[in-house]
Amino acid sequence: IRRERATSNICTNQGLIALASTIYMSLLGKHGLRQVAELNYQKAHYAAEQINTVPGYMVNPVQPFFNEFVVHCPIPASEVNQHLLAHDILGGYELSKDYPELENELLIAVTEMNTRSEIDYFIDVLGEESDD
């Protein structure tokens, strides 16, 4: 399909994402990319450790992870996400959308863009939900 006749702009979107990613990675350089990866890892593991301190919430202690992990919640993940959204936090992915038996499981991703204070606020809001 020629771009002029295409009914979708998927090719343009893919091109723009590829270009933005290339620019970002080239600006970071080899050492910068490693630093970003280490930040992702450290922040995600900090978040997981803090989540484990909230009553009723648990990150699988034996499953290794980089910057995404599954959290077992004491209530359905959809309710957790509603509570988080009420506090201006976009929660994790509700695994029950793909696996109905995982109703209380939430997939959380932490990146270099998340500050420590944002992670701490997230933990505080989770703690409020577990107190209710």
Give the role of each language-model region.
Residues 15-17, 23-30, 74-77, 96-98, ...:
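Short, glycine-/Ser/Thr-/acidic-enriched flexible segments
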Residues 62-64, 86-107:
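Conserved PLP cofactor-binding pocket of PLP-dependent enzymes
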Residues 97-132:
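PLP-dependent enzyme catalytic core of the Aspartate aminotransferase-like
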Residues 1-55, 59-62:
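Active-site C-terminal subdomain of aminotransferase-like
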Residues 56-87:
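Conserved PLP-binding catalytic core of the aspartate aminotransferase-like
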Residues 46-54, 79-89, 125-129:
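Generic non-transmembrane alpha-helical segments
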